[in-house]
C-alpha cells in the first residue's frame, strides 16, 4: 500500500504516471496521492505547501493525475517496462516526456494530454473522451486551463472549459494568504475542433446558467471567443436519442 505519494516542490506534469508505473511494477495494489489543495486556498498554496495540486490552479498537473489514475487501474502488477528511455512508453497508450513536460494517454477511445502534444490520436474516429491542456492534432487552443470533451452519444458531445491559470509567484516559496501564487483569469479564446464524429459543422449550446451565450452554429470547426463553461455540441443533422 502506498500512502501517500507526490512529487514535491515541482510544477511539472510528467511525474504522476511515471511514479504509478513504478509502484505497479513493484506490486503495489493501493496507491494514494497526497494532497489535493482546497479550492479556497489553492490561490496561495498554503495547504501542505510542498504539494500543489488543484484542477483550476494546476491544470497540467491535474490532467497528469487523471492519466496516472488510468495507469493505476490498467497496468498489471509486477509488469516491467524496461529502463529509460524505453520505459517512457508503457501499458496501453501511456507516454511520459521530461523534454516536453508531458503525460499522455492515447488508447483509441481516450486521448488525454497534460501539455501541448503533436501525437495524433490512435484512432480519432473511435474517440469518446478527450482531456487536455494546450493544443493537439484534434484541438487547437491557446488558453492555459484544462478542458474536457466527452461523447454522450454519436454526434453529441459535452465540452467543459476551465479558466486560465497563470503563475504569478513561486508556489513553493514561503506561503501567505496575502500572496497569490496562481491567478485565475476568465478570458476568451478560440477553440478549433477536428473530431470526426462531431465534424466541422455543429451547434453550440451553453449549459451553465450564468453563461448568456446563445445557441449558435459553427460551420468551420472553430468556436470563436470561447469562455470558460459547459457546452453541448451537436453535429449538424444529428437527432439525439436522449433529451
What are these model-predicted stretches?
Residues 37-173:
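Aromatic- and carboxylate-lined catalytic core of secreted/periplasmic carbohydrate-active enzymes
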Amino acid at each position: 500500500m502506498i500512502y501517500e505519494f507526490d512529487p514535491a516542490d515541482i510544477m511539472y506534469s510528467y511525474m504522476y504516471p511515471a511514479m504509478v508505473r513504478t509502484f505497479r511494477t513493484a506490486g503495489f495494489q493501493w496507491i494514494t496521492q497526497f494532497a489535493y489543495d482546497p479550492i479556497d486556498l489553492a490561490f496561495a498554496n498554503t495547504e501542505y505547501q510542498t504539494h500543489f495540486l488543484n484542477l483550476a490552479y494546476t491544470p497540467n498537473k491535474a490532467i497528469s493525475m487523471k492519466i496516472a489514475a488510468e495507469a493505476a487501474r490498467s497496468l498489471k502488477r509486477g509488469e516491467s517496462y524496461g529502463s529509460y528511455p524505453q520505459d517512457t512508453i508503457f501499458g496501453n497508450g501511456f507516454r511520459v516526456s521530461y523534454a516536453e513536460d508531458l503525460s499522455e494517454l492515447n488508447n483509441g477511445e481516450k486521448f488525454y494530454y497534460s501539455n501541448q502534444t503533436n501525437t495524433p490520436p490512435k484512432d480519432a474516429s473511435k474517440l469518446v473522451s478527450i482531456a487536455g491542456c494546450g493544443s493537439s492534432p484534434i484541438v487547437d487552443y491557446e488558453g492555459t486551463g484544462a478542458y474536457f470533451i466527452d461523447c454522450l452519444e454519436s454526434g453529441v458531445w459535452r465540452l467543459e472549459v476551465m479558466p486560465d491559470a497563470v503563475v504569478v509567484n513561486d508556489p513553493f516559496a514561503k506561503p501567505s494568504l496575502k500572496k497569490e501564487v496562481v491567478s485565475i483569469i476568465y478570458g476568451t479564446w478560440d477553440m478549433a475542433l477536428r473530431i470526426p464524429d462531431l465534424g466541422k459543422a455543429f451547434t453550440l449550446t451553453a449549459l451553465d446558467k450564468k453563461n448568456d451565450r446563445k445557441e449558435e452554429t459553427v460551420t468551420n470547426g472553430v468556436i470563436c471567443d470561447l469562455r470558460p463553461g459547459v457546452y453541448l455540441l451537436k453535429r449538424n443533422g444529428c437527432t439525439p436519442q436522449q433529451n
